[in-house]
Amino acid sequence: MRRSFGMVFAIVLVTGCQGSEVVSAPEGLMRIGTGNAGGVYAVYGEGMAEAVRENFARVTTEVVASDGSVENITMVTLGKVEVGFALADVAADAVAGRPPFTEPQPIVALANLYENYVQLVVRDHGPVKSLQDLSGRRISVGSRASGTAVVAERILNVAGLGNDVIRRNLDIKMSARALAESEIDAFFWSGGLPSDAITQLMHGTDVRLIDLKEVAQPLIRAHGELYTETTVPASVYGLSSAVTTVSVPNYLVVGRDMPLTKAYWLTRLLFDEQQKLAQTHPEGHHLDQWTAIRTYPLELHEGAARWYRSVHR
């Protein structure tokens, strides 16, 4: 029989640098910054919130929709949410104080969750057959405060298209609708696989993904090895073949000042409730105790680090 953390694990002994310490079950508010409806952040965040509600009677949860990574980090640092999803490239800019951030942001990580895949979506019989065909075209580069917008601009610049496209800042659902209605010629999306909005788009519109092999290595050389050249498997969306793209890890980020109790239990909850999270979205299967600690350049929150040490002994 399944048991609740709130009832069974009221306290736990954790071995730290100063010996055994008592970590009590959390209480208070847990607001989760997610992302666009139709994306994985929104689905994963709802699953996390449900897991918290089921296990911690004294924690009140709220799922906060957002533009994505940039807005989530901003909300964490302003105390508008306690935890948020963020792409590793955006998180790296945040702690370094690089644009779009004006100064270093005091964030740390609980886990590396899964990989986001850059997806450049076009109509199957439309005018865009390759990345270079975007020249002069109307494209959505994602919501303004999103990780999609960051990587889309980097790809366009690496491809020499930075000044040659007509940009629109649309979220994933609006992008899909605009493409279906021929209001745009293409849209960028950085998300897990599959992304619901793209799956739904494919049910009523003939679309495909553009191969990004030509910019994969130049992007990595220009912006670092947080990016990886990879493929979107054909099976994910029923494509005719796999499509080369770039991926970047997703981190679960919190403020440095998050209480140790909350950080410890939320990290533990991710793993103890992994099966349920994976039922919420397949990306939940990719959580792993060893890859989860790879959150460069973010430090792990001490509460998260203590939980990982307890299972890695």
Q: Predicted regions span which residues?
A:
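Bacterial N-terminal signal peptides that target proteins for export
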Residues: M1-M7
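C-terminal motif of bacterial Sec signal peptides marking the signal peptidase cleavage site
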Residues: L13-G16
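Bacterial signal peptide processing site
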Residues: Q18-E21
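Extracytoplasmic
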Residues: E27, F56-R58, G68-E71, L78, ...
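Bilobed "Venus flytrap"/periplasmic-binding protein-like clamshell domains
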Residues: E27-N55, V59-T60, E115-E181, Q275, ...
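Acidic, polar ligand-binding/catalytic clefts
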Residues: L78-E115, H125, S195
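Pocket-lining segment of extracytoplasmic ligand-binding domains
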Residues: A88-V90, G97-P99, G126, N163-V253, ...
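Segments of small-molecule ligand-sensing domains
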Residues: V243-R313
